[in-house]
Regions:
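Catalytic cores of alpha/beta
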Residues: 5-16, 54-66, 100, 104-106, ...
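Hydrophobic, well-structured mid-protein blocks that either form specific transmembrane helices
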Residues: 9-59
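C-terminal helical cap(s) of enzyme catalytic domains, especially alpha/beta-barrels
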Residues: 36, 87, 94, 119-121, ...
Length: 155
């Protein structure tokens, strides 16, 4: 789910069903984030803020202030299809989010060759659906991801 309202109710459902993380879209009111986060804490889970569309670093500071530790930095499928690449503006925003204290899951057409771009970012996860699903040899691509991650972050 990408929750925009009813944070408490949907968090109870998600964490009650065994989820570890629940995503709240960045356009949600702060009250939705607070209520979802309260349930996440009680249930041993975490909230991720999906950064899609309009958001500010002040928003990110407010989420972090109430205890949110994660955000998803998303390059949309349409943006990627139109030729948008990861650029300095993206990397600067990700670095600023990292400096606030947020861990980032990065998604949007990520390939193993992209990973060095994110070396200075506090990365929690890479969401790499298209790179794997569209590959002729998905296990080989997965291994390339693992190798690059190990080489860059030592994990």
């Amino acid at each position: 789910w990408k929750v925009a309202d009813a944070g408490e109710t949907l968090a109870e459902q998600a964490f009650g069903a065994g989820a570890n993380w629940m995503t709240i879209i960045c356009a949600a009111p702060l009250a939705t984030v607070e209520r979802g986060h309260e349930v996440a804490l009680r249930r041993g889970g975490e909230i991720q803020m999906e950064l899609f569309g309009h958001w500010t670093l002040d928003d990110a500071r407010a989420w972090h202030h109430i205890g949110v530790k994660q955000a998803i930095y998303h390059r949309g499928r349409d943006a990627q299809a139109s030729g948008q690449q990861w650029d300095e503006a993206d990397l600067a925003k990700m670095k600023a989010l990292s400096d606030i204290g947020l861990q980032l899951s990065i998604t949007g057409g990520i390939t193993p060759a992209d990973l060095p771009l994110f070396k200075q970012i506090n990365v929690k996860a890479f969401i790499a659906g298209r790179a794997l699903a569209g590959a002729a040899n998905p296990p080989q691509v997965a291994q390339a991801f693992h190798s690059h991650i190990r080489d860059i972050w030592g994990a």
